[in-house]
């Protein structure tokens, strides 16, 4: 996948399904290392939204800014990313 926003990545994580159900790895340090992504988990949240729900932008100014790992566990989601780093060549770009 190619994105307009500099630094935006998609990780393909392990997924296996058989007659018993399925098994998915939701975090794998090696996946981040292969993409040369310095990522350290500080917090983890799970949210369940009803159909048609629109959630707000997530942004923190330094020194509180941090990377985001977004996963859709069931159903589907449209996750929109907006480049707000004014020093980035992709400033103002949008990807989803």
Show the residue positions of the predicted features.
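Non-catalytic, conserved peripheral segments adjacent to functional cores
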Residues: 1-96
